[in-house]
C-alpha cells in the first residue's frame, strides 16, 4: 500500500514533491495531479487536506522517520518548526527577511543540523515561487549560495523537470504577479475544530440567539461564525433567534442593527425566529411544573433570595400547596399589584453545590409592553427557562455555548427532563477575550453615555461595526475567529493577532499613495528634472488594480526625518521615480535643515543599499493637495488584562485618539468613503471621510480623514507619522530639562493632591456614582498632564522638581544613578511580589519589561551592568542634608490620620455597621497607608512612630574605603535573608496557607541568589559578613537614647508578665488578643529605637560611638577568652547529652552556654559562629582541628544531564520522580502523590482533591469492609454534618481533645448566627440524642449503625495529604448493646476486620493492641488499635481504632432500656469504630519506591495494563491491526476472568513512555505483547514490585495472571513484614531505648502505664536543640499495648523510664508517630 499525493496544478508543492521522491524507496508515494486542493491519502484511507506546502512536508517526514528529515532530537525538531513557521510568514513577501536569512545561513551549509531537512525544503519553496521578484531586489550572497545548493539537489531538478506543462505555466516568472491574488484567495487558515458528538451530515441544527439590546461585538461575532461553520460543515441548518424574553431591554431598532451586523459578517441564517413565538407554550409548561410540584410561587425579596441561595436555605414558600401556587400564579398572569411581588421558581435542590441548581427563577411578572406582543402578557420567562424549551421545540441538535455557561448545563438538562422534551447536546467553547478592552455591554454603554467615544461604531470599540470602521475586513475577521476554532482554552488574545490576519487580506489589494507630514517637510531641488506627469501602478505587485498619475518636477517635498537621513554624495531612491544623487543638505544657523540640493541619476539602477523615500512634487496650485488628516488610535483601556475586582475606569485617562495634519497626494481625491489604502512607508488606512470639493455655502473643501489600520507589528513603520502617546523630539528635549517644567509640575502636584482628597471625600460620603466618576476622570486627566510635564508617573508623597535644588553638573549623573538604582530595587521587589502572588503573565511581563528598561538606563549612566547590592558613588552630601522638619511633620500628620481612621474602622465594626460604610472607611485607611509608604518608603506597621526632627546636624568624619559597597551590601543581604527566614518559620509554625508560605520562600530564594551574585558563594546557615575595612567615626550630638530603650524594655517585660498571667488564669481569647497586639507594638517600637529585634536577653545600652573595626582590630583578649569558654561549655553540653544525664542537668548546662554566647555577641557585635567552631579569633589565629567526620550512609549519585556530541545539555524528561525516598522523603512523597495522579492541591490549606486513582483505592476498601460489616448485621445511615454547641459540649471529657480542632460556623452571609454551629469532628454527639429516642426497650437493641462521611478537624500541625488533613473521609460505626460482653466482642471483631484491611487489601503488616490511658479515645473505657510502621521515616502511624465507650455516653445522653427481668432502667453499652483515608497515605509510604507508586493488587484500580510493543515504521498495517486486536482480545479475556485490566493503545506515546507512566502510577502488572510474542503465542508479564519479567503462554492467562497477582500481594506483604520486624526492638534500659529510637526503630519496652510517666518518657526522648537539622525532633510516645506480648513481665523488670519506681505491667510499643 502506498501514500497517494494529489498535487494542485495551480500551486504545485515543489519541495513536497521532492520529499516524496526522496522517501519513495521505503515509503511508496503515488503522485497524482489535479486542480483540487493538495492532499495526502494514507493506506488506512485517512485523508489529510494540505493547506500549505508545509503540511505535505510534515506528513511525509513523519511517515518516513528513518530519513530524519524532521530532525533527530527535540532541539532539532524545534528549530525545524521555527523555520517552517518562518516560511509561512513569508508567503506574501520574503524580501523583508533576506538580511535576517543571510545572517542565519552565513556560517552553515543547511538551516538545521548541518544536513538536508524539511526546513530547507520549506524555505526553498517560498523563494522559488517568487525568485524573479527577489532577484530584482537583490539576493544577499549567502542566501544565493544556499538557494543554488538546494536547487542543484538531484531531487529538486527531477521535480522541476517532471512538472506538467500546466504547472510550469503557473510557476513561470511572468505569471508570478498574477499568482499573488490567486494565492491569497486560496489561503485557508482554519483553527482546530472538533467534530460535534453525534453529528450527522444534513441533520445538524444550530442556533445563534442574541438579545436585541445592543450592537454585536467581536465575542458575538465568534459565536455567530462558529455556529455558521458547523451548519455549513455538516450541511445543516442555522437558526437566527432573537431572545426577547426581557421586554425592558429588547427593541426593534437593535434587531435591525444585529441583522445588519450579520449581513456585514456575510452570515445568512436559514431560519429567523423569536423566543416570544413560544410564550403560550411556555405558560403551559410553567403551569405543568407547578401542578407536578416541580415549581412554586415565591415572594422572597431579591436580596434575601440571593442570600438564601448562597447559604442554601430553603424559601418559606417552598412547601406551599399546589392550589396556593396556582392561585398566586393567576395573580401574576393578571399582572396585579400582588402578582408583581411574586416570581416562579423551579423546585430543584437548594443543597446542591452548584448554585444554578438552587431553585432558579423561571418566570417573573413585568407589567411592561413587549416590542412584539405588546401588552398581551404580564409574565415573561427567564432565558434559562426559555432556552432549553425553544432549543428542543426548534429541533436544535447541538447547543453551542461559551464555557462560562458550563455550570448551567445541569439546569438546562433538568428542565428538559422535567418537561420530557427532546435533549439537544451542549457543546462548550471558550469565550473570546481581547486585551486592553471590555466586552461587557454595560461597560461599553458607559463609554458611549460618558461621551468618551463617538458611538457604538467608534473605531476604538470592539463592536463589529467599530472594528470594521477602523479598517477590519469581514474576511480578515472571519479568518481570525475561525482560526481560534472550538477550543475550550480561555486565553486573552492580543489585538495585534487579529490585525495581522487582516493585513494578509488587505495587503494584496490596497492601492499605494503618498502623504507627508504637513508641518515637517523639506524641499529638494532636483537639477535636471522637468515637470511631467507619468502613470504608475497603484500596487507594485498587481497591475490589475489600476494606475495613478505621479507629477515629476525640479522641486519636490520630502519628510523632515527623511532629510535628516540623507548623506551628501550618496544616492537615494525616490519611489516611483528612481535614484537621485544628493549633492548638498542646506542648514540654517541653528542646524535645522532648510533644503536639499540634488541631481537626477536615473541611469544608476542599483537600489540595494540606497535610502528609499516617499515624496510629492511641488504643485503650482496649493489647492491641488487635498486637506488630509491621519487619525491614530490607542486601546480604550490602558491595562492589558483587568483583575477580577479592578475598576476599568482607573485605566481610561490616557490619550486614545490623535489627529495629524498631512500633505496629501492629489490622487487621494479619487478615494471613496470606505476604501482601504496604504500610505507608503506609513501603513494602512481606511477612508472614513472622503474628499469633497469646496461647498457652495462655505467655499471650503471637505478634508480626507484617514483612520490608521494596525497591521499586527509591534515595531513602528519607519516615518509612519505621530503615534499616540509618543512625544516628538522637541517635547522630549523640553521634558529633559527639570528647571523648565518645575513650576508647572509643582502646580499640577498640588492640583492632583486636592483632587485626590475630593475623590476620597466623595467616596466616604457615598456620593452619587456619576459624580464620583466625573471627579475620578478629572484626577486621571491631571495625572496624565503631570506625566507629560515630568516624563514620569505621579506618585503620592513625591516632591516636584521645584522643591529640589538643581544638582551640580559634576554630581548629576551620580544622583541620577542613585535614583535609578533605587527604582531598580523597588521594581525588583514588585516583580518578586507579583510572582509570589501568582499574578497573570501579562502583568508580570510588563513589570519585568520596566525592570529591564531601568537596568539599561543604569548602564547608560554608569557604564556598567547593574548587580544586586550595587551602590552608585555619589557626591559628598552637604551639612544641610539632614531630613527636613517639614517632611517629618508630614509623616507625623499621616500617622495621626492612620491612627484616627483605624479607630473609626474598629468602631464601625464593633457597632455592626453596614458593609458599604465599613468598606468606605477601610478604603480611606488603605489610601492613608499608601500615602505613608510613599512618604517614608516602608509599609506602615502598628506602633510605628514618626522620626524625630533633627536637632543638630550629624558630623561624619569620612575616610577612604577601598570597597564600601561590597561590605555594606553583604551585611544588608545577610540581614534580609535572616529576617526572611524568621518570617517563613513563623508562617510555618502558625500553619499559614501553603500559597502564602510559597510566596515568601520564593522571595528568600531570590535574596540568596542575589547573595551568590554578589559574593560568588552559596549562602549557608551561620554565614557572617566580613568586617568593614574602614573606620567611620560618627559623633551624635543628640540626647542619650538609652533611657528610651530602657523604658520600652521595661514596658515589654511588664506586658509579657501580664499576658502570661492572663493565660495562666485561662482568660478568654478576646481578652488576651488585644494584650498580645500591645506587646507586638512595643517590640516594634523597640526595634525602631535600637535597630534590632527584641530578644529575651535584650538590655538597655547607652548611646556610644560605634566603630566598625577591621578583622585585625577585633582580635581582643576578651573575645579569645569567650571563644574558649563557649567551646568548653559546648563540650560539656554534648557530654551530658551523650551520657544521658537528667534533663535538669542538661538544661542548666545549655543555659550557661546561651549566656556565654549572649556575652560574646555583646562584646563583638556578632553572633558566635556555629560552623567550624573556630578558636581564638584574630586574622592569623589557627582554627581548632575539626572533629573526625563520622561516616554517613552513601547517598545515591545525582546524575548530571547527559551532553550530546555538540556539548549541549540534552533535555531531561520530567515524567519521573526528581526526589528520592531516602534523601528527601517530604518532596518524594509530594511528587509521588501528584505525579501518580492521586491528589490535586486545593486553595484551602489542609484540604485536598482526591483524584480517581486514589478514590478507587478508598472505594475498594469501602466495598470490602461494607460487605463484611453488613454480614455482621450493621446497617447504613447518614447524620448531619453540623453539630449545635450545646450538644457538642455535653460530654466535656469527650470534647476536650477535639476542642482546639473544631471548626465553627459563625456567620450566615454578613449576619452573625444566633449560636455558633460546629462542623463535626466526630459524630457521637450528633447520633446519640437520636439513639436515646429510638431505644425504649431491650427489643430495640442492639442498634448497629455505620455511616461513610467526611469530618473536619482543623489541626494546626503541618498538613500532609492523606496522613494529616483538615478534612478527611472515613467510616464511623456506632453501636449500642444491652450486654457488655457482646459489646466487648464486637470491639475485637471489628479490629480483626481493620487488620485484614491492611494485610488482605493493602499488604501492610500491623500490630494489634490496646491504647494506654493517655492515648485512648476521650470519653471511652478503652481503645483498641492497629498500628502500622513506615521505615522511611522511622515513625509509626495509627491505622484504625475500635473503641469501647462503656456507659459513659449513654449516661450523658440518657440512652436507656427497660430490663425484661427487673423492669428497671439500664444504660446501654456502646462502641464506636472508624478507619480513614489515612490508610492510602500509609500504603504509599510503605510500598512506593523511587520510580513511583506500587499498588497492592487487591486495591489497584487497574491490576494489569496491556501495552502493545514492537510496532515500527516497517510494521505492516495488517500486522499492526492484528497485534492491536490480539491485545484487545487478551484484555477482554482477563476482564472476563475477574482481573481489572485495561489496554494502552495510544499511538502518540512510545512503549517506553507508557512503561514509565504505568510504573509511576503503580499498576501491579504490565503485560507486553509484540509481534514476536504473538507468533509464539505468549506474553511478557512485568511485575511492578520487583521489575521481574515472566513469560506466560496466552492459553493460560486466565489462570496464571490471577495467581501471579496473589503472588505479588504475598511478596509485598512479606517484604513489609520483614521491614517492620527488623525495625522492632525489644529494650529494657533507657540507653538502648534512646539509641534504637534514633536509628528509626519502634520499641517494645516494659511500662507501668501511668500518664505522668508516659509524659516523662516523651519529653526525655526528644532531640535536643543541637541535634541533626531536619531530623524528627519529637520524643517517643506509646503506640499501643500489643495483644501479643513479646515476653511476660519478670520480677526483676523495671519501667523503661529510669526515674520511675512503679512496677511495669506490660510491654508497650513506643515510637515516634504521625
From Swiss-Prot:
EC numbers on record: 6.1.1.17, 6.1.1.15
Positions that bind ATP: 1353, 1355, 1364-1365, 1438, 1441, 1476, 1478
GO biological process terms on file: glutamyl-tRNA aminoacylation; prolyl-tRNA aminoacylation
Catalytic activity field: tRNA(Glu) + L-glutamate + ATP = L-glutamyl-tRNA(Glu) + AMP + diphosphate; tRNA(Pro) + L-proline + ATP = L-prolyl-tRNA(Pro) + AMP + diphosphate
NCBIfam families hit by this protein: gltX_arch, proS_fam_I
Assembly information from the UniProt record: Component of the multisynthetase complex which is comprised of a bifunctional glutamyl-prolyl-tRNA synthetase, the monospecific isoleucyl, leucyl, glutaminyl, methionyl, lysyl, arginyl, and aspartyl-tRNA synthetases as well as three auxiliary proteins, p18, p48 and p43.
PANTHER family: BIFUNCTIONAL GLUTAMATE_PROLINE--TRNA LIGASE, PROLYL-TRNA SYNTHETASE
Protein name: Bifunctional glutamate/proline--tRNA ligase
Source species: Drosophila melanogaster (Fruit fly)
Taxon lineage: Eukaryota, Metazoa, Ecdysozoa, Arthropoda, Hexapoda
Gene that produces this protein: GluProRS
